[in-house]
Amino acid sequence: MAHKKAGGSTRNGRDSEGKRLGVKRFGGEKVLAGTIIVRQRGTKFHPGVNVGCGKDHTLFALSHGKVKFEVKGTKNRSFVSIETE
């Protein structure tokens, strides 16, 4: 004989995994060519000098140097550049 009544069903109880987006290398950090700087959805940060943009809008270093974040333009866009030494 059951000691508990049957539990009801629910339509909740699931969620997607986090996608690990965000800034991976911060301003002033030294990076090598190919290092991922930002993983993002859309272009929250735009590629500047010596920075490439992947098909999923990932920004990566095209040369060795220091990461530099700057806001410029009339639309106040954030750009990521690499200053070579």
Swiss-Prot record:
<feature type="region of interest" description="Disordered">
    <location>
        <begin position="1"/>
        <end position="21"/>
    </location>
</feature>
<keyword id="KW-0689">Ribosomal protein</keyword>
<dbReference type="InterPro" id="IPR001684">
    <property type="entry name" value="Ribosomal_bL27"/>
</dbReference>
<dbReference type="InterPro" id="IPR018261">
    <property type="entry name" value="Ribosomal_bL27_CS"/>
</dbReference>
<protein>
    <recommendedName>
        <fullName>Large ribosomal subunit protein bL27</fullName>
    </recommendedName>
</protein>
<keyword id="KW-0687">Ribonucleoprotein</keyword>
<dbReference type="GO" id="GO:0003735">
    <property type="term" value="F:structural constituent of ribosome"/>
</dbReference>
<dbReference type="GO" id="GO:0022625">
    <property type="term" value="C:cytosolic large ribosomal subunit"/>
</dbReference>
<dbReference type="GO" id="GO:0006412">
    <property type="term" value="P:translation"/>
</dbReference>
<dbReference type="Pfam" id="PF01016">
    <property type="entry name" value="Ribosomal_L27"/>
</dbReference>
<comment type="similarity">
    <text>Belongs to the bacterial ribosomal protein bL27 family.</text>
</comment>
